[in-house]
Structures are given as structure tokens and as C-alpha cells.
Amino acid sequence: KHQFRREAVRMAQQFDYPKTETELRKLQDKLYQHSKKVYDEGGRPALKGLLEIMSAEATIITAIHNIKSNHGSETPGVDSKTMRDYLQHSHSWVIRDIQSAFKHFEPQKIRRVYIDKPGKAEKRPLGIPTIRDRIVQECMRIVLEPIFEAQFFAHSYGFRPMRDAPMALERAKLLVHHTGYHWIVEGDISKCFDRIDHAILLKRLYHMGIRDRRVLQIIKAMLKTGVMDECEVNEEGTPQGGLISPLLANVYLDIMDEWITKQWEIKKTEYPFSKPYRKYKGLRRTALIPGFLVRYADDFIIITDTRAHAEDWKKRLQIFLHSKMKLTLSPEKTLTTDIRKKYIKFLGYEYKVVPGKARKGYIPRTIPERDRLRRKTDKIAHDIKKIPHYYSREQMVDAINRINSQIRGIIQYYQCCTWVNISMKKYSRRLQFVARRRLTQYKGKWIPANQTQNLPRVHQQYKQKIPSMKYRDIYIGFTVLSFCKWEKTIPKKEEETPYTEAGRQLFFERTKKKRIHARLDEMYSEKSARATRYGQWGKLNNFEFIMNRAYALNRDKLKCRVCGGWLISSMPWAHRVNPNLPLNKVNRVNNLISLHKKCLDAVNNPNYGISEFDAKAQKKIIGYREKLVPSHTRNK
């Protein structure tokens, strides 16, 4: 252990702070690989010098971009500021402000709001930090996540990258199928996030490799942050709403994961086994109690072989949580269930096994959780009825698209259920008739789905009639809840992670989604960067412009949008297509294009001769010139 610790500290001291997003991503990979190597060899990493990485300019820009992409970025904290306020400051001011926050971190109080809990009278408290504190938290998450991802239990799925709820359900089904165990402990921790002990959490962070005491002090200050109009100091819990809170909750619950899995699933044996099933076969000859864990945030199940063992797990877990983590199991919601006789509820799904042609004699049956599905369809029916009667046909088309998005969202979440189509049919007809009545004033009709013009990928597969309205000689229809089929979930591969090249390739093979390219800040000259950082080109060249011009260059694939030539040999220039837009829109990526200097001059100067350009480029130049009217603004 001492050898691992010395090696880890030396490794940490070799890390240089990143100067670009490309370097930041490489550094994340290094942090993951180092932590994984030490962990797999039986130790724990011991990393220092993390604050310099968190407060680096490249990390701050990435953090702001991540937050800006979420709808919550326009939700103000106690200081009434939103992300828009930061984006409109100069680049240098934003960087200095966040770096200053890291050096002298004093978090502002949290603004508390309460949201409805589905199907419950009580409300869920959400703590909203200020934008400044959110940026600091996101900078920390970017650096800490790869360190913890290398050490987390392989089958915890909540709040982790490249993982989702269907994977957790699929893991449970596979365990039952392979082991033949049918007794489930349905775990429910009472107010888990509100009762996390700060001292235990900080010790766990230190244990998992965070040896930079400055970082631990900042996290401690975050945890202790008071709530406006409620308390000066928060003595326990992580604020639900903080960007780093889900990661910290996983760190805390990893204590439970480690305790459960070391008793059976990853128990060390005197002699190594070449295959896991041989190890479990040997363990079954001992007095140990079998148990396999699947966890998603604070929802978890333990799969075991008999009722007595299930009750034993429940009893011992209650003692462990109380004594080691200061948490308690909810006695009403923590159940032991034989899934051959009764459904369990897990992550919004219901799961049991029924007799069938399988090696162990049972096959899985999964359905959407009935109460939750009913509430969701009730809400959609209510939303359809509430569509204003004064809506024009254009507005009604937008309303139909919004409702269809809600319906397809429900289908997407539940299509991993084997009986999804049967379950959806029970609620589908009601929504159809509600939708048809709402279209009466637009002379709505029942039209075959494959004859409507919206959602073609879905509707072209079905001839069933759906409520539709005519709009400009085409039919737009409300989609149907039963337009769904079971889709098998691909089991999670432990090697799939955002922090290795092989892991990213596995993610692409599973989802066909490519990783977004890193910002190309290094493509802009240092002279240009200095001028824009210190606001020498006016208020339009604010932080948002500096950040988004690099993302626009990515979108343009390093090619000039006028002549199509490569922008590698010379510095690219960012041009605002419409410089007359308001400040909150003028620097968005969709209003920025990348050009050669010569092409930029041709666009901005109406007297510039364009005969040297080919016909296609000339047409583009003329088009961009027209959008500059009434002002010709030179943008760099």
C-alpha cells in the first residue's frame, strides 16, 4: 500500500494543467487509467495537485459549455444571476472570477424550491446554487469523475456516464436467468440524499484518492452551505440540485456497494478461479449467503436464493447502514419478494418470472410500473385538453408535436419491457379519443398513420387510424402510445467508459453516437486570443463568442464555409452571419461561421471583387452580404 501511495503521489505531480480542451480530455484519460491500474492491483490512488487542473482556463470553459447546454442554466440562484449574465461578460473577467472563487471559496446560500413527487402528497426539495458555484462544481466534477469511475462497483448504474435504467433492469434479469435465484430484497433507503453524513463522505473521498486537501475543503464548504431563509449551516445531506451532488452520493453509497459485494459477488478466495461460475460453485459449498447487487442511485435490489437468506440480508444491511453510514432502510418499502409469485418494482418497471422454455424453467416478464404509467398518461390527457381553443392551425401543429414528444418519451423509456405493447394498449385508446375531440374545431379526421406527414419513421410502419388534422394539404396526427415494440437492451460492458479509446469505441458500436470533438482553441493565434480575452474588440466579442467560435469550427469540420478550403494552414476567422441579432443570440453557434481571411473580407466588404471565386462561392458571398444589411460589421 505504501508503494502504491508513493507511486500515485509522484504520478499526480507529473500532471500539467490543461491548456486546451484536447489536453483536458487526455488528462481525464490519464486520471482514469492511473486510478484503474492502482485499484486493480489492490490499492487506491492518492492524487494531489487537482485544484490546478480544476481551475485551469480550459476546464472552466468546458464546464460553462456543459452547464449552458442544460435548461437549468437560466434558473437563477439567490443572486438572481443566470448563465446569460456570465456569457455576456468579457472572457478575461469570467476566467478571473472563477479562478478567484477556487482560491477563496465562499459559497453563497442555496435557493430552495420544492417540486412534486410523482404520486405523492409530499414535495421534493431542490437546492439551486448560484451560477458561480455551479461552474465551480462542474469544474470539480470534470476532474473527479474519471478518478471515481475507475473504482466504482461495476453494476451501479445511476448518475454515471454511458449507463441508464434499462441496463440495470437487464442486469437483474441476467442474474436471475444465470443463477436461478428468485428471492429479491427491494432496498429503499429513507431520505438517502438528505441524511448523508459529511464526515463519513469526506473520509471516503480521501480513501478513494482525493489527497488534495484544498479540494476536500471546498467540498466541505459546499456541503455546509446554508439555505436562504431556512438555515445558516447545513449539517447533513447533499443538496439535490447541485451539479456535483450525484457524484458525491455515488461515492457515499459505494461504501454499501463494497460491503455487500465483498461478501459474495467479488469475495476474495484463497485460490483464484479461472471462471466466475466455478468460484460461485465453490462458495455455495460454504456457509456464506449468496447475494448479487444491482444499484441505481439510491434504488437497489439484492438477488438471493431463499426467503431466509433474503430476510438475513435485509437484517444485516439495516445494521450496517445504521452503524457505518448513519442511514436507515424504510421498513414499509424494503421488501423481500419471490418473483415467481409477485412483481417487484424497480426504477419505474415491474419485473417477475413466469414458467417458460429456459434453462432454469422461467422466463422474464417486465412491464411499465402501472401506477406511474397511469399518472403519465393522465398528465398527457390533461395537457391535450388544456390546449387553448383560440390556437391557429400553425400553433396547433406545434402543440401536436409537443404532445407527440411526450408520448414518444414514455415509449422510449419503457420499450425495454417485454410486455410494453400490451401495457401501452390499455391506455392508448383513451388518449386517442381525447385527442380526436380536441381536433373537432379543426375538422379533424381518423387518418391511417402511414398517410400522415409527421413522425415518418414511426408512422410509416402502421396503418392504424390516428386523430389528425389537415395543414397545408398534408395531415398531421397525434401519435399512438401503442406504436411500440420491445427492444432488447444490450448488457453493459464494464470496459465501456468515456475515459478510454476502447471504451468510447464500444459506446459508438452500441449507440452509433460519435463523441463531440474537442474545442479547437489552439487554432486561433495568441495575438487574437489576447485581444479578445481583454475585450479590445468591443462587447460583442464576449465570453460566449470566444467559446462558441471554436465549437463552430468543429461543426464546420475545419473548412471555410465560403470556398470550402481547409482552415489548417492559416488562422480561421469567425464571422457572425447576422450581426444585428440581440446580444443573447448574436454569438450562438448557429450564427457563427468559419472563414479564411480573404473570404471574410469578401463577405464584409461589398466593394471587394469576387471574380476570383467560383460560382458556388460567389453565390454564398452574396447571400452572406445580404444578411449583413443594414450594418456591415467586421468580426474576428
Describe these PLM feature segments.
Residues 1-92:
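Non-catalytic, polymerase-adjacent accessory regions of viral genome-replication enzymes
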